[in-house]
Amino acid sequence: MKKLFATTLFLIAAIGLPTLGTAKNTSKNKAGGSSRPVAARIPVQGPAYATREDVMRWADDMASRRDLDRDWVRQAIGQAHFLPGVPRLMLPPPTGTAKNWRVYRSRFIDPIRIRAGVAFWQANRATLERAAKEYLVPVEIIVGIIGVETVYGQQMGSYRVIDALATLAFDFPASHPRAAARQEFFRGELEQFLSLSQRTGADPMTPVGSYAGAMGMPQFMPSSVVRYAVDFDGDGRIDLSSSPADVIGSVASYFKAFNWQPGMPTHYAVRFDPERLDKDALLAPDILPTFSVETFTAKGAVLDGVALSHKGPLALVELQNGDAPPSYVAGTENFYAITRYNWSSYYAMAVIELGREVAAAMPAASTVAR
């Protein structure tokens, strides 16, 4: 579908209901999140960035590079406020904090979210099937993403986007191990946000989203709105907050862009041959699919059934379970594609399993509906 940026497009794409954000909006790498809708929390605001000379110099430079109105950019950034509670939310958990897939899973795969997923699927069945046909991305994956991200629009964030982005662009926590790179990332997102706002006539003070600046039902960052959002309902604008069709099409568009392979499983079961196992070598590439089936099995990872005929590379994915033994799967290129939406294997498995649970609940729900 054509990407259309009408005067109100970006404003519509960005505004969400004032509810608390979810896993992606909080921290892209943490095993956490809430599965139930909660009351909005209005973040405490600190000083306005108009008082920061370094920020105003950055605004001047950005306006020049982007060919934007200098006074407008200075005014917009100057009205953004530091959010004192946000920087700490970006810090990784303390060293030694155990990840726990079972706990993480329980936060996203529960009856409330599954019922919401069934209702979303039933209400948007034709659109989901159209997106799956056009982009060759399974309905289960689209449904899983939207459910994990915002419980199908119930938790889209309560932070003013310009405040969140400015805070992370200019006051990213220096103690973060990748502080420089992450700060540069958020400066780029702030640029995208302001560029879209000025060129579409939208008020940059209005949109709300997550504390990381993600927006709408699919929790797209501004750069993702630019690159992947589509007008899937054909009304001439992209609305990622209240148009399920645009949300569905945009999520499918995202996965197509990240090389989703039609018909390929996301992962396979795996067990180990203790006599040949070289787990360190198998885990060294992390979740990047690297090994052929032959190399995978030669290093002691045992596959069965259809997995033995898999043609692409595989990765050994480890999901820690606290003090209990870890779980393992053989991740494919499609598993890796899900981690491009959120760089976490735990997130990817939650998306996959939520989609499956919703799909499994659909027949019974359809029977009851009759």
What are these regions (language model features)?
Residues M1-T8:
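Bacterial N-terminal signal peptides that target proteins for export
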Residues T8-G16:
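Bacterial N-terminal signal peptides
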Residues K24-A123, E129-A132:
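An acidic, Gly/Ser/Thr/Pro-rich helix-cap/linker signature
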Residues L68-I77, P138-G144, P204-G209, D235-I238, ...:
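Surface-exposed patches in mature extracellular/periplasmic domains of secreted proteins
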Residues D69-T97, I146-T150, Y159-T167, A269-L277:
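Acidic helix-start/capping segments at beta-turn-to-alpha-helix junctions
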Residues A98-S250, K256:
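Acidic/His-rich structured neighborhood in mature extracellular/periplasmic domains
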Residues R237-S292:
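Ligand-binding pocket segment of bilobal, Venus flytrap-like solute-binding proteins
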Residues D273-R370:
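C-terminal soluble interaction/assembly domains
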